[in-house]
UniProtKB/Swiss-Prot annotation:
One of its GO terms (cellular component) is cytoplasm. Keywords: Ribonucleoprotein, Ribosomal protein, RNA-binding, rRNA-binding. Protein S19 forms a complex with S13 that binds strongly to the 16S ribosomal RNA. InterPro entries: Ribosomal_uS19, Ribosomal_uS19_bac-type, Ribosomal_uS19_CS, Ribosomal_uS19_SF. Belongs to the universal ribosomal protein uS19 family. It comes from the Bacteria. This is Small ribosomal subunit protein uS19. GO terms for molecular function: rRNA binding; structural constituent of ribosome. One of its GO terms (biological process) is ribosomal small subunit assembly.
Length: 90
């Protein structure tokens, strides 16, 4: 289910302000955030955002294809180690 058309896309205010400030200064620093639910805006293109996965911050380089998606979509929170083979138990 998508977000209502009456509502604007969500982005954390602090994150947006940091990106806008860096765009004004021409800087490219890594920005740490815990806001996995923030929508990626076109202003974020070219920046690296460190998104929290529950135990560490994972750097995500934002490209044009990511605009409109959420930051949390690009960072996995669970590790899958696979199932054991039945032959290994014997």
């Amino acid at each position: 289910m998508s977000r209502s058309t009456k509502k604007a896309p969500f982005v954390h205010e602090g994150l947006f302000k940091k990106i806008e400030e860096m765009n004004g200064n021409g800087e490219k620093k890594v920005v740490k955030t815990w806001s996995r639910s923030s929508t990626i805006f076109p202003q974020f293109i070219g920046h690296t955002i460190a998104v929290h996965d529950g135990r560490k911050h994972v750097p995500v380089y934002v490209s044009e294809d990511m605009v409109g998606h959420k930051l949390g979509e690009f960072v996995l929170t669970r590790t899958y180690k696979g199932h054991d083979d039945k032959t290994s138990k014997r």
